[in-house]
């Protein structure tokens, strides 16, 4: 019986912190903060749309409209002004909006910290110790457009590839939750030369291509961007 008792507690705790996946119960159940505490902005937007879809809201967005049109329960109305939320639904929408605002504010602070980091590095004030490929970091972050980072759930990403016939270099930033990775991948051959079969003046036999990867990792902690893992250069 003891084992069953502990198992029941474990299952209860798991259910209590389970994250909300849809709004099937949002019309009758007040959602708790713990149920959405780990959800991303995208997922919170989905919950809001799911709640409205269950009321028959007709979406203008093509992708969203197509998604809900495939649901057997979705019955879009002709006039969206006729869609009315009850008190419980209004409370849930407010919760989603408040949580979304918090996440958006934190994301903007992270992006601002990255903009400041890039500006400081370009002024010659790099936070990367000199024995951690500091000169490569300066070149890498200069290529990254912070304002063009796009997000899917809690992951943000931007990369740019530069091919100058001599070789191909990829510069990127990857954000996963509170972890930020800035990297540079160097390839010893040109994709353009290879694809177009461009002949060089001195033709030589094919040779092994030298590749190398360098990256630096940061932690977004207490509203600050902290360099926390030494850079790695492989190749």
Where in the sequence are the language-model features?
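Exposed beta-sheet edge and beta->alpha loop/turn motif
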Residues: 167-235
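Short N-terminal segments immediately surrounding and downstream of signal-peptide cleavage
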Residues: 19-42
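Compact alpha-helical subdomains of small soluble proteins
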Residues: 59, 66-104
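Bacterial Sec-dependent N-terminal signal peptides
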Residues: 1-21
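Short, aromatic-enriched amphipathic alpha-helices that serve as compact interaction elements
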Residues: 109-125
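Short solvent-exposed beta->alpha transition segments
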Residues: 130-175
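Sec/Tat-exported extracytoplasmic proteins
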Residues: 48-51, 55, 100, 121-125, ...
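Amphipathic alpha-helical packing elements
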Residues: 35-76
């Amino acid at each position: 019986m003891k084992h069953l008792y502990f198992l029941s507690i474990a299952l209860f705790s798991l259910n209590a912190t389970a994250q909300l996946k849809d709004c099937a119960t949002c019309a009758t159940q007040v959602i708790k903060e713990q149920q959405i505490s780990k959800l991303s902005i995208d997922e919170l937007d989905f919950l809001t749309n799911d709640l409205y879809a269950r009321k028959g809201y007709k979406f203008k967005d093509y992708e969203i409209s197509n998604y809900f049109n495939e649901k057997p329960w979705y019955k879009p109305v002709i006039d969206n002004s006729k869609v009315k939320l009850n008190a419980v639904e209004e409370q849930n929408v407010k919760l989603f909006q408040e949580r979304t605002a918090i996440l958006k504010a934190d994301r903007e602070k992270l992006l601002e910290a990255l903009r400041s980091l890039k500006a400081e590095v370009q002024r010659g004030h790099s936070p990367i110790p000199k024995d951690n490929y500091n000169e490569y970091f300066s070149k890498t972050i200069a290529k990254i457009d912070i304002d063009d980072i796009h997000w899917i759930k809690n992951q943000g990403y931007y990369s740019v590839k530069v091919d100058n016939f001599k070789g191909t270099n990829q510069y990127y930033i990857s954000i996963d939750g509170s972890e930020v990775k800035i990297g540079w991948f160097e390839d010893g051959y040109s994709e353009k030369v290879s694809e177009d079969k461009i002949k060089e003046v001195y033709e030589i036999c094919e040779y092994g291509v030298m590749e190398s990867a360098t990256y630096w990792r940061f932690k977004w902690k207490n509203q600050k961007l902290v360099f926390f893992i030494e850079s790695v250069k492989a190749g």
